[in-house]
């Protein structure tokens, strides 16, 4: 999808865009964050409280989050808690991509989702902060058909 938007709408990747703080090309070439060290730290400290981990890649939230859930559990993610990234707004606008398709294709700036016991979420978030991460509580898991609901 991104190739189509680039080929048809964003042909000049050297254009500086103030919203991005860099050129489109520089933003698209920004390296993927690697979460191994902070994740290993958190697993070592809170292993029994971690119920699932999902690397949000191609397939976005709708395909990746359910993979970490057992049958009978549904994730509810509050989209308003996800900080907006200008590059995704640009891609959606230039490519006329519907919002649901954006969340089904891209990670929207959320590279990793961790499901933890509700009573340990603050402790796990604190441990991630101590590792230099910026965790956000995006929602919760509840009983239901295995899957994910994005709530606006």
For each predicted feature, which ranges?
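Buried, small/hydrophobic-residue-enriched core segments of structured protein domains
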Residues: 1-8
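Glycine-/charge-enriched secondary-structure boundary and capping motifs
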Residues: 8, 12-29, 33-152
């Amino acid at each position: 999808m991104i190739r189509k938007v680039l080929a048809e709408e964003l042909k000049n990747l050297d254009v500086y865009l103030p919203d991005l703080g860099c050129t489109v090309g520089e933003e698209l070439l920004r390296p993927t964050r690697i979460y191994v060290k902070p994740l290993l730290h958190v697993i070592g400290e809170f292993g029994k409280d971690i119920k699932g981990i999902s690397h949000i890649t191609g397939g976005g939230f709708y395909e990746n989050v359910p993979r970490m859930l057992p049958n009978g559990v549904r994730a509810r993610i509050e989209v308003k808690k996800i900080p907006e990234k200008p590059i995704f707004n640009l891609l959606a606008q230039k490519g006329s991509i519907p919002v649901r398709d954006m969340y089904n294709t891209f990670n929207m700036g959320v590279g990793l989702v961790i499901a933890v016991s509700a009573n340990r979420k603050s402790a796990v978030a604190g441990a991630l902060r101590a590792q230099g991460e910026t965790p956000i509580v995006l929602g919760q898991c509840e009983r239901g058909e295995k899957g994910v609901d994005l709530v606006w």
